[in-house]
Amino acid sequence: MPIGVPKVPFRSPGEGDTSWVDIYNRLYRERLFFLGQEVDTEISNQLISLMIYLSIEKDTKDLYLFINSPGGWVISGMAIYDTMQFVRPDVQTICMGLAASIASFILVGGAITKRIAFPHARVMIHQPASSFYEAQTGEFILEAEELLKLRETITRVYVQRTGKPIWVISEDMERDVFMSATEAQAYGIVDLVAVQ
């Protein structure tokens, strides 16, 4: 039996009465976000709007993005990454569970020195994928060119944010490379591994 979204008590500063809000709204008010699903346009737009709203509300208090995602749509993930770089507050990224594919790209986009992985978290990087089998020949060529541009952009960001040479990133993106939390720290994707 599903329990739905739990409700928790919340009292706004200066108000005497406590109201019950769903847990996600309560966490958003504390500047905590969760990417706990495949990255798509809907979750991307939700996270972007929350980051922008809260950065306007208070631009000096950090935002926290908890990630447990298998990846998803590249463009939607890049939009989240770009917003993280655009907003004034630092965005701390915390990997819990899995940050794979474009989710690892979002993870590496956190504020330098403020990217964390839980001890048993896993990180996976690889090159962007496509649905070539559905395309006609002309579309296939255009899609391949676009995919190559996206791969170059993603590679440059990983190089910049991890400090790894371009040849290492390019080689590792040829296949699925899974890392433990400590391996992701050594690689430069995260800065700290949370202690148990």
Curated annotation (Swiss-Prot):
Reactions listed under catalytic activity: Hydrolysis of proteins to small peptides in the presence of ATP and magnesium. alpha-casein is the usual test substrate. In the absence of ATP, only oligopeptides shorter than five residues are hydrolyzed (such as succinyl-Leu-Tyr-|-NHMec, and Leu-Tyr-Leu-|-Tyr-Trp, in which cleavage of the -Tyr-|-Leu- and -Tyr-|-Trp bonds also occurs)
Keyword presence, Protease: yes
CDD domains the UniProt entry points to: S14_ClpP_2
Keywords: Chloroplast, Hydrolase, Plastid, Protease, Serine protease
Subcellular localization(s) per the UniProt record: Plastid, Chloroplast stroma
Catalytic-site annotation from UniProt: 101 (nucleophile), 126
One GO term describing the cellular component: endopeptidase Clp complex
SUPFAM superfamilies: ClpP/crotonase (SSF52096)
Predominant subcellular localization, coarse grouping: plastid
EC category: hydrolase
GO terms (BP aspect): protein quality control for misfolded or incompletely synthesized proteins
Gene induction: Repressed in darkness. Slightly induced by high light stress and during cold acclimation (at protein level).
Molecular function (Gene Ontology), one example: ATPase binding
Subunit structure comment from the entry: Component of the chloroplastic Clp protease core complex which consist of at least 16 proteins: CLPP4 (3 copies), CLPP5 (3 copies), CLPR4 (2 copies), ClpP1 (1 copy), CLPP6 (1 copy), CLPR2 (1 copy), CLPT1 (1 copy), CLPT2 (1 copy) and 3 copies of CLPP3 and/or CLPR1 and/or CLPR3. The core complex is organized in two heptameric rings, one containing CLPP3,4,5,6 in a 1:2:3:1 ratio and the other CLPP1 and CLPR1,2,3,4 in a 3:1:1:1:1 ratio.
Function summary: Cleaves peptides in various proteins in a process that requires ATP hydrolysis. Has a chymotrypsin-like activity. Plays a major role in the degradation of misfolded proteins.
Protein name, as recorded: Chloroplastic ATP-dependent Clp protease proteolytic subunit 1
Organism, scientific name: Arabidopsis thaliana (Mouse-ear cress)
